[in-house]
Amino acid sequence: MTPVALYSPDPARGWLPWVWLTPILMILFNAVPVIALDGWMQSQHWSTPRGDPIGLAGLHALLWIGFAPTLAAVLAWARLVEGSSLASIGLTGPAPLKTFLRGLAVGFGTVALVVVTIWMAGGMQAAGLGQAWRSPVSLLHIGLLLASFMFQASVEEVIFRGWMLSVVARKTNVAVAVLLVSLVFCFLHFSPHQPPMVMLSTFLFSLFACAWARWTGNIWGVMGWHAGWNWLLATGFELPVTGMDAHLPALLVALRPQGLDTLTGGAQGPEGSYLCSVFFVAAIVWIQWRKTRVPHNVSLTSR
């Protein structure tokens, strides 16, 4: 395979970093703001010394304040150092809002499919139906969380599947780019004592997102999917998303895990279940199969 411009033929008018430098830059773009803001976040009682969010306010702070500086740093680097256009990092294509919203709907559907599959396998027990609808305040918070997760998910897609994937692909090839992006994505989501199944699911999550972006030729759809996945998982079932609790009643059905952590995902939530990994493998295979049947730049969410 040869170097390729994934999203746009627009040339970089500045300097593209060496391949070995891109993971270091990505880690710095994420780590420096976290370290700089850690003391202040703790002083506001928004995070613990380990960096975990405290309550609903802490979750909002993490999703906005924790990700905004990273987005600003990556966009500034892409524009000022590389001279890259927004199109070259995946923010291109017709009807971006429509594509994003369709991706959002796919996110709702796919995470619901995973949760229902775990429940049917005996890993979940229902403990209440639509309790959030009894509280207007809870519904308001759930709506605000949708905006927060839309921002957080969009930032992650811009920096990983947008900027990093496109830069490495221009310097090497698509296979190396997908592998490197997914490894760095895993590294930045790693926490001590995390079960191997969780890391496998995180790696497959990134492979799936890369496959989607690679096929559609933009990141609008996968941005929406990522947001829909995180939000409904956090608010729909009273289950943790990547180990974080929204502290809100369920929008759909309150579920309680039962059985082995390999089935339920344990403290990490359904993303730590082997059934979630099975879903990602099947979805990646489906995308690869679809690529042989429809044109490369047809949106995944346009059918």
Q: Where do the language-model regions lie?
A:
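Residue-level signature of the transmembrane alpha-helical core
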Residues: 64, 104-108, 142, 146, ...
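Juxtamembrane helix-loop-helix connectors linking adjacent transmembrane helices
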Residues: 35-61, 84-155, 165-170, 300-303
